[in-house]
Amino acid sequence: MVKKQKIMLIVMASLFAVLTLLYFLVFAPLLEKKNEEANPTVEPPTLLDGEQLDKDDGKTILMFPYAERKEMKSIEVINQYGSFTCYRSDEDDNFYFKGYEQAPLSADTLASLVVSAGYTGTVERVTEKCEDWGMYGLAEEDEPAYYKLTLLNGTTHEIYIGDLIKSGGGYYARYKDRDALYVLSNTIQSTLLVPLETLVTPYLGMLMDQQSYALTDEFILLKNGETFVYITYDKSTQNSGESVFSVYDMHYPGQYTVNDSKYTEVLLTFCNLQGAATVKVGGTDKMLHEDEEVMAQYGFENVSNAPYELYYRYGDQDSLILFAPSGIEGYYFAYSYLYNLIALVEEATVPYLEWNTKDFISDQLFHESINDVYDIEISGVITNGAGVVEKEIDETFNLRGTGNDIEITPVSTGKPFSTDLIRNFKQFYMVMLLVNIQGYMKTEGVEDYSKLEEIACVKVTMDDGSILEYKYYSYSARRCYVTVNGEGEFYVNKKDVFKLLCDANRAANGLTVDRNMEYSDYVD
């Protein structure tokens, strides 16, 4: 049995040796030959004068040696839309469009333009000697697109771009004074074959960052030439250490409290205020808004009376933008004075153009800190349901000092409040803060405001001498029209005004004031 096993091992070893020999002598050469036939060695193409092989793949022909951005001085382009030149400034080493230096050029756009002009990797070299340029849209009479790349060392490269090849994958091209015909990738169609406007980033105003947008000094919105909203940043609140209701002041339509939440939505848009596309660029030597014909084409028949005008300022940099309907659903035309361009802008980018004034205004009428108030004068009448006067109120409070050192004196008694009565007065102060706007007067059908009866007046003199005067006019059983320093377009609940009058009287006379009580709780 052992002998048979040894014989089998010898036979198998011999067979393995024979098969191995056959593989190396017969099969291996055949497989190698077949592999060579399937994957023949590609010899690098013969280069013409001026050409270069792509160093990465070793086979793509470049029409001229690859040029990087750091080597470039300028790129001059002529195509069916006109001409433009992108050049490197000697002053700051940045790239600009010649004659349109104010036009924004993004880093991404510049990178694409630089690659298109500096890397001429060909799809193929069709022929080394073209006999008929007209067949490819490259004859002189065809007026082919053209670009000239100038390097900092003085070297220039000039390329003509002809027809699109049938497959759409590239364009016929030639190098100036060279007979060879090439095909360049169709990626050049988004950089070298477009109008200047396509390459200009449609920025509209100064771009704010996340640290500064909330510090925007001024914001003004006009509609049809009329001021609609005017808000400023109150720098006095900065680093004051005091608790404030808002760091913004509203100057128009009145001295109302700014709705900080909604206004923040506005300011946030300044971090990336740009359009969807640039449609017109003005030159450095002439502002577009000076050309009435051009402006009219984009809906700006009268720049001083534009449908919408947006202005904002941060420090010494200001931005002014006009908006007009574009005729394209969901878009405006916008003209930027800062960049001298007209862009197509999505309505969603600037939704506040269509807001009403109440969107910018907090429901809270009065919002000043008690530490900033000098005097409060309150007068008025409380009437019953029949309009009969039930009580007349006339109270004045002097406020001196701040915080725990504040001293409050009702003029009617001439005696400063004790600590407990100061605490009670602060309940009344909260009642002042809780008189809220309820809605628009224009929806109430009041035709003649001059005939409305004044039922209350609250005059607040601030430490800085400024005055806020609130007047309330009865026009229904439940509502009052309110004005702030003579301006008004809103109404409040009459019961809140009556509670304000009643609590002023109670505070002056040392009676308990509860901000949570309804006026009806006093009279029931």
What are these regions (language model features)?
Residues 2-524:
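Soluble, acidic/polar mature domains that operate outside membranes
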